[in-house]
């Protein structure tokens, strides 16, 4: 005696309704042999659909034993049950359960996707099945473009896609007119003749007459099990080979399933464009904000540091006075040329320039304007990093001989001469009451501290002391520290030296590195604060992704049930919704990055001296962040989708 393909022994299935336990099946024992055409009949609530769900491994029994081809179903985990449904069963539903986003051909292919078949093999087999069922010309139509009978034919083709041994049909004619229902029954009878095991759940006695075995249920009990005179079909060998002879490798199967998952995610997004865009919007704003804040912070910092460099690179400057803002600083005359010479002899000093200054007027022909007169040494321009635009700088001889040679800045040139850079070279201007010959023009310095619209004239400091101030004391001593020496250590040494020379600390030191560090710290703090706000926006966007995905899961529970019924593993469902959430976040991240880059380019056009740039690292980090948000916030909805039992998901369609 051959082993039955399906064997149920003392099966019970109980449900809780409030505090009451209801038995849908009570002590059902059945054996179903290969090649049988079985009809399960009964009134509504008799337990026939529950029995069909247990037979198809969509539901589990409360007690009892169920074996499929000799294998105990109770010993199988969720993935093994999915494999059993995928390889042994085909389902035909009363409401068809076709996926609305897919055309008929791709609906038929779904079981083979989860089986890991190649795309070409899937398509060829699906086309053969549709052609066999008279649906070849409508393979590209979506479910809403098909009649009920046509949709049920597609459902039958899907049930046969993986070469199912057992076809389970739940009220297959219940939603069809008589003609369409008759066509579906003829197809099922034909499949039975070819060797398939067909189990039909119906309440229609006329449908049950087509079966060679009729099982009647009442209140969860088998009250009748009759066989007709019709012979059991055993001609399985004559059935065309719908099931593939070979499968792709495990890794290829994973790749195919992932590609299908990605395609389904894109289809779902396309079907709900506005919802997808609104979901992305939080991510777009967050990524654009974070990327822009980082880039703007770096640009601001670079701009400020560039402005600080205009004060001199690696420099410290000594001023008279007990402290900054000392009201008596102007009366302190102890900072003199000998101090500058003493500092110049120190090994850690790369350059020294004494400075004196005063304000006066400059006249050239009929033009007159107030200027700042700076008395400096030739090395001043090197220490400050100043570039010459035209002419030359005065030399050491001019300083020693107290010559009246002037170097003017670009503002002074434009005020008194034409826009030609060389226009003022060799001209004599009156600085106060002193005639001075212009020998050079320095290039305009962008930014800096204070207004860059001031007019400045640079003369040898000896000339300013002799011709203008009549004072031997200095306004300041500007020092350039050797590159290998810390400015902090140099500041301590200068303080020690001058305190010893003056017998008191009657000077203050401006360290440009201190300014640089302070401003850098400040800009970083501000950037951090703004970035924190942007990160909050990202988190809000991530929560939005999670909320929308939870809504999507609720709307697509029926789809989840269908996919599980045709063999999708829990990890396949998890992957599908996780990929969708990740895709939404990643596309939002890309859009946010593009907006940030466009904003940076616009700022660069509007503010030439302010250069916003985006590094490959920052762009990559922004993209990875958006992807991580999709994975993190999409995991919970995806896990919820994967946690449904197939029978529960199908019942909520």
From Swiss-Prot:
Record EC number: 7.6.2.-
Pfam families membership: ABC_tran, FtsX, MacB_PCD
UniProt xrefs under SMART domains: AAA
GO cellular component: plasma membrane
PROSITE patterns for the chain: ABC_TRANSPORTER_1 (PS00211), ABC_TRANSPORTER_2 (PS50893), MACB (PS51267)
Keywords: Antibiotic resistance, ATP-binding, Cell inner membrane, Cell membrane, Membrane, Nucleotide-binding, Translocase, Transmembrane, Transmembrane helix, Transport
Gene3D superfamilies (UniProt xref): P-loop containing nucleotide triphosphate hydrolases
Main localization (coarse): membrane
Protein name: Macrolide export ATP-binding/permease protein MacB
Species whose genome carries this gene: Bradyrhizobium diazoefficiens (strain JCM 10833 / BCRC 13528 / IAM 13628 / NBRC 14792 / USDA 110)
Lineage, broadest ranks: Bacteria, Pseudomonadati, Pseudomonadota, Alphaproteobacteria, Hyphomicrobiales
